[in-house]
């Protein structure tokens, strides 16, 4: 029973409790009205920090996915341009194959050349004009790579590079060596000794892309031998370097040779790397060496050799798979028989007669080394056999502007150039496609990560309505009971009046 009237302890305590309940009820009301569990740092300091960090990550993930979408759009534009370029290269290749057919007359080949030039110009224009948001995509601008930032952290980026596919940068790194010829009024063996360009000593090395080779013994300089080494070397195979060899030996218009009485004419043919004759033909007195006869004699003894003799426009033509062709002609007797080696190898200017009873000549095959990247070469010691003014160096690109299909040789070279160019463009297109797939996978993963991050933030920051409504109801009932009890507490001092009656 209260016996003092200046201080109502019960009312004061009830009032304090009422204010606390009011504060808690109001906060619960705000949570229900905003949907937020954390209204200020005072509500949950550590929770607010974690939620804000999660929100920051979520924002970064969202923008990163936008970046990916922008990048995919740009890459799709680039891929479309590269696809057009590939289609035009394929058409150019088709026309080069057509031009390689010798049934075409010069006018037909000229028309094919014009078509190829128009397609080449179209490729140049596509590569120069394909862009996204002002950034050129196919002219080499992106050659060194750009970064696509896909995540919420500074290190979360992907490098994307697209090589230059302009016509001036498409082609092959080509070392096109033309086999040379030489001759002497001497034996074939001495010819090789005199001009060492046509002889590869076992102490000499050939080098391609830093890979060197030496023959086990001294051999005749031979394009087929070098091509076989290049194509068979594992290191060069891994680099993608390939080689082709061919040899077409054409003589001057054939003039029948009559062997005089008392004379004998011996013709020896050397094929490939060997200094031993592969074919020996002997014509005695009274024999007439016609074009048909020498062709028949050569072919009958060429079994096992990559060699065939034939007639073209009244000339002797000897073809090999790149093997060097050497010839040694000797005459015995004092008759008036003469034989010009130019009938076998045009341009050697050697004639066997009573004055010069022996002469030799050699024709090395052509060698073509090709790759899709630059490489070094070193032919020191045999450079003269292939017409190289620089025995060593670095091979530069032979681009689409170098294509000329107005000859059979040019058309076949164009096919090699276009094959490498098409491979490069197809590789670039494949890389773009792989990058798009990679970016799409990253996008999907980051989208899931964003959803999970948002959910984690939601658990910390946002209110659980079921739980909070229970809390609000509790505080509301407390307020109602508190107000009622405060009224009762305020009435307690009035009981003192009973003592004053």
From Swiss-Prot:
- InterPro entries found in the cross-reference section: Flagellin (IPR001492), Flagellin_C (IPR046358), Flagellin_N (IPR001029)
Q: Which UniProt keywords apply?
A: Bacterial flagellum, Secreted
What Gene3D superfamilies does this protein's entry cite? Answer: 3.30.70.2120, f41 fragment of flagellin, N-terminal domain
One Pfam family assigned to this protein is Flagellin_N
Hydrolase among the record's keywords? no
Q: Which GO terms describe its molecular function?
A: structural molecule activity
A single GO CC term for this protein reads:
extracellular region
Report the subcellular localization. Answer: Secreted; Bacterial flagellum
Signal peptide residues are none
UniProt main location, coarse = secreted
User: SUPFAM superfamilies of this UniProt entry?
Assistant: Phase 1 flagellin (SSF64518)
Biological role: Flagellin is the subunit protein which polymerizes to form the filaments of bacterial flagella.
Its family remark reads: Belongs to the bacterial flagellin family.
Q: What is this protein called?
A: Flagellin
User: What organism does the record attribute this protein to?
Assistant: Aquifex pyrophilus
């Amino acid at each position: 029973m209260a016996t003092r009237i200046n201080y109502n302890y019960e009312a004061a305590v009830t009032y304090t409790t009422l204010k606390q309940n009011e504060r808690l009820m109001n906060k619960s009301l705000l949570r229900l009205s905003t949907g937020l569990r954390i209204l200020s740092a005072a509500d949950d300091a550590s929770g607010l920090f974690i939620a804000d960090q999660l929100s920051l990550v979520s924002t970064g993930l969202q923008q990163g996915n936008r970046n990916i979408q922008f990048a995919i759009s740009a890459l799709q534009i680039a891929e479309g341009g590269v696809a057009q370029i590939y289609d035009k290269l394929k058409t150019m290749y088709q026309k080069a194959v057509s031009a390689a057919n010798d049934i075409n007359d010069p006018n037909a080949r000229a028309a094919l050349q014009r078509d190829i030039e128009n397609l080449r110009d179209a490729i140049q224009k596509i590569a120069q004009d394909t862009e996204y948001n002002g950034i050129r995509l196919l002219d080499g601008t992106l050659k060194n790579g750009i970064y696509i930032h896909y995540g919420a952290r500074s290190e979360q980026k992907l490098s994307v590079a697209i090589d230059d596919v302009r016509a001036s940068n498409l082609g092959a790194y080509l070392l096109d060596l033309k086999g040379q010829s030489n001759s002497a009024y001497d034996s074939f063996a001495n010819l090789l000794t005199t001009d060492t360009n046509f002889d590869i000593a076992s102490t000499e090395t050939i080098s391609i892309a830093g890979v060197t080779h030496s023959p086990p013994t001294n051999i005749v300089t031979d394009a087929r031998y070098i091509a076989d080494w290049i194509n068979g070397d594992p290191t060069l195979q891994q680099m993608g370097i390939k080689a082709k060899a061919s040899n077409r030996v054409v003589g001057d218009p054939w003039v029948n040779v009559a062997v005089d009485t008392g004379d004998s004419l011996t013709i020896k043919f050397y094929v490939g790397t060997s200094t031993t004759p592969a074919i020996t033909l002997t014509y005695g007195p009274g024999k007439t060496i016609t074009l048909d006869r020498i062709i028949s004699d050569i072919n009958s003894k060429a079994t096992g050799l990559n060699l065939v003799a034939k007639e073209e426009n009244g000339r002797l033509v000897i073809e090999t798979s790149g093997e060097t062709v050497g010839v040694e002609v000797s005459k015995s007797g004092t008759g008036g028989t003469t034989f010009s080696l130019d009938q076998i190898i045009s341009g050697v200017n050697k004639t066997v007669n009573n004055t010069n009873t022996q002469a030799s000549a050699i024709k090395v095959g052509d060698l073509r080394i090709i790759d899709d990247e630059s490489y070094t070469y070193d032919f020191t010691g045999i450079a003269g056999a292939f017409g190289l003014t620089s025995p060593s160096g670095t091979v530069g690109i032979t681009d689409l502007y170098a294509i000329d299909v107005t000859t059979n040789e040019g058309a076949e070279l164009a096919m090699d150039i276009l094959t490498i160019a098409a491979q490069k463009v197809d590789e670039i297109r494949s890389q773009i496609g792989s990058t798009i797939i990679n970016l799409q996978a990253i996008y999907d993963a980051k989208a899931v990560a964003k959803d999970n991050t948002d959910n984690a933030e939601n658990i910390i920051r946002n209110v659980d309505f079921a739980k909070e409504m229970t809390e609000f109801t509790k505080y509301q009932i407390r307020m109602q009971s508190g107000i009622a009890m405060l009224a009762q507490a305020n009435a307690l001092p009035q009981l003192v009046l009973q003592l004053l009656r």
